[in-house]
């Protein structure tokens, strides 16, 4: 078997193995049953995740913020940290006002696949909004965070010296986010998390079912299901792909 075929085989098997590991990360998130925060791999790439967080208390109460998670090419084997990018105009000491990236260094120095998982990132995202002051106090080692090490110095200054103004800026972030929550998706991906405005003719039947004490026993609608906007490949599909790839490699070896 030629070197080129071997390299192609190894690369494909590595991608399949990575797919299993990313799927395992998603399943762990489901098992943790995190409330108010959701994330799912995109349809086009397992290394791009779409997420949204809903906050019900504190300075960011009644808010919903979108974010994306970008995993390194060799995830989870690289020590390089994933990248979390929020939508624009979210005022927080740990979120860069230019790149909109979240600073993960207060809780992650490096990424270690035997210690860290994507659900840890989601918990950290919840923590920075639930307790902004606490999130800028200590690093992962329990040491104080230097004031010069935060992503947004203006947010840090207001949080430390003028909570009223900080709360107003946080409120502005919330208003902006809700204003753009129903915008057309910026990417053509069926896994992008989509929100629709409430329409009685479409949503009232489901609301009645949810409010019913025995809604599980109510008759199911016979109308066709809506287009899925949050689907990932199942383990069975990944296994079928792996078996198909393996059969292809065996065929190549026999030809050579």
UniProtKB/Swiss-Prot annotation:
SUPFAM superfamilies named in the record: UBC-like
Gene3D superfamilies: Ubiquitin Conjugating Enzyme
Superkingdom of origin organism: Eukaryota
PROSITE patterns in the cross-refs: UBC_2
InterPro entries referenced in this protein's UniProt entry, alphabetically: UBQ-conjugat_E2_core (IPR000608), UBQ-conjugating_enzyme/RWD (IPR016135)
Coiled coil: none
Domain UBC core, residue spans: 17-179
Family affiliation: Belongs to the ubiquitin-conjugating enzyme family. FTS subfamily.
Protein name, entry field: Protein crossbronx-like
Source organism (scientific name): Drosophila mojavensis
The organism's taxonomic lineage, starting at the top: Eukaryota, Metazoa, Ecdysozoa, Arthropoda, Hexapoda
């Amino acid at each position: 078997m030629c070197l080129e075929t071997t390299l192609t085989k190894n690369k494909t098997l590595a991608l399949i193995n990575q797919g299993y590991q990313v799927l395992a990360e998603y399943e762990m998130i489901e098992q943790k049953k995190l409330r108010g925060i959701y994330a799912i791999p995109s349809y086009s790439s397992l290394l791009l995740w779409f997420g949204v967080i809903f906050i019900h208390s504190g300075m960011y109460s009644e808010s919903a913020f979108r974010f994306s998670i970008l995993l390194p090419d060799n995830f989870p084997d690289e020590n390089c940290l994933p990248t979390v990018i929020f939508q624009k105009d979210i005022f927080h000491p740990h979120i860069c006002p230019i790149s909109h990236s979240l600073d993960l260094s207060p809780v992650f120095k490096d990424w270690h696949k035997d210690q860290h998982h994507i659900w840890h990132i989601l918990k950290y995202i919840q923590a920075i909004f639930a307790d902004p002051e606490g999130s800028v106090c200590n690093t992962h080692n329990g040491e104080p965070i230097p004031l010069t090490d935060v992503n947004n110095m203006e947010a840090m200054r207001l949080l430390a010296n003028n909570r009223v103004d900080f709360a107003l800026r946080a409120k502005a972030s919330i208003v902006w986010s809700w204003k753009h929550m129903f915008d057309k998706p910026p990417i053509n991906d069926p896994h992008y998390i989509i929100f629709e405005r409430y329409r009685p003719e479409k949503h009232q039947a489901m609301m009645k079912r949810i409010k019913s004490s025995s809604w599980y026993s109510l008759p199911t609608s016979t109308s066709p299901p809506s287009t899925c906007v949050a689907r990932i490949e199942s383990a069975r599909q990944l296994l079928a792909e792996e078996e198909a790839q393996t059969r292809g490699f065996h065929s190549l070896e026999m030809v050579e």
